[in-house]
A protein has these predicted regions:
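Short linear capping/connector segments at secondary-structure termini
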Residues: 29-33, 88-89, 158-166, 200-207
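Bacterial N-terminal signal peptides that target proteins for export
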Residues: 2-9
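Bacterial Sec-type N-terminal signal peptides, specifically the leucine/valine-rich hydrophobic h-region
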Residues: 18-20, 144
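Short, surface-exposed recognition loops and adjoining beta-strand edges that mediate ligand/DNA contacts
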Residues: 60-75, 157, 194-221, 228-280
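Bacterial N-terminal signal peptides
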Residues: 10-17
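Conserved, well-structured interaction surfaces
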Residues: 39-56, 78-151, 166-179, 185-195
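Membrane-proximal, proline-rich intrinsically disordered regions
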Residues: 21-66
Length: 280
């Protein structure tokens, strides 16, 4: 009898074990690729991750101007002043302007997004897919432009997501660099909206779009990049497109003589309808 009970117990345990093997648990601490690319809301959350690049631009990138006569830092121990006066020398091992690793990481993130978007493009309306691609290509051009400014437009340029384990990827030529930046930004200018509609419910949802890159941002970035490339006609044409979009110096209709000064008195948290602002 005891032997029979043992056999039944072992059999029951084995059956439960086999049944347990068929259970596919739902992970609650991460999302699969299919979930991340399943709908428009998740697509937008994916894109939001790139916007820290704009916040970073208005931090260290602007502060770099303090190494010239464009901007002044007040503190004698501000790093920019230490560099200028030689108290903190720049060396190959310690270079605060070095963005090689950071920008190449972002470059690959943009390529990975575009690769996955191409694989899941059928999940979205074509207009939304084009807008998403345009946003990602804007940011890819932005990080490549950052690399071009630092490394003479000769760096490791990935036009597509590289194969895992790929080594010895040759640096691009300056012509390849500027052509690729031009292609990305002209695509972005074509498919980004002139202005995001904050009240839209379809297809992006009800959340505000203030601060998202626009057609003007793409043309403006292209004009600046082409100046660095010394492609004067391309720079002039892009700047003209910005002008056509109606950007203008800020003025307060009720106090036209105080408009410019008021910009420096507004809180960052308060929204100002400012036609002078191209990239926020």
């Amino acid at each position: 009898m005891k032997s029979k009970n043992k056999i039944l117990a072992v059999t029951a345990f084995a059956m439960l074990s086999l049944m347990g093997c068929n259970i596919d648990p739902i992970l609650t601490d991460s999302y699969s690729e299919d979930v991340a690319w399943s709908n428009v809301d998740n697509l937008r959350l994916n894109l939001n991750g790139f916007y820290s690049l704009i916040g970073g631009y208005y931090g260290s990138e602007v502060e770099n101007d303090a190494c010239t006569d464009i901007l002044k830092m007040n503190g004698p121990r501000d790093s920019e002043n230490l560099f200028v006066f030689g108290s903190a020398p720049i060396t190959p091992a310690a270079n605060p302007f070095n963005n090689w690793d950071n920008r190449h990481t972002w470059q690959l993130s943009c390529c990975r997004f575009l690769h996955n978007l191409a694989e899941h493009r059928g999940n979205f309306p074509e207009s939304i897919a084009n807008e998403a691609e345009a946003e990602a290509r804007f940011f890819r051009a932005l990080v490549n432009f950052d690399l071009a400014k630092r490394f003479g437009a000769s760096f490791i340029l990935h036009k597509e997501l590289p194969v895992m384990g790929e080594k010895n990827h040759a640096r691009c030529t300056p012509e390849e660099c500027w052509d690729f930046i031009y292609e990305d930004l002209t695509f972005a200018a074509k498919y980004l909206p002139k202005r995001w509609d904050d009240a839209t419910k379809d297809p992006w949802g009800e959340a505000t779009h203030t601060g998202r890159v626009t057609q003007g941002a793409a043309w403006g970035m292209l004009a600046r990049a082409m100046l660095y490339a010394q492609r004067w006609k391309d720079a002039s044409d892009a700047a003209l497109e910005v002008k056509k979009l109606g950007y203008a110096l800020y003025k307060n209709p009720s106090r036209p003589d105080k408009g410019y000064g008021e910009l420096f008195m507004n809180r960052r948290s308060s929204r100002v309808d400012n036609n002078e602002s191209i990239i926020e």
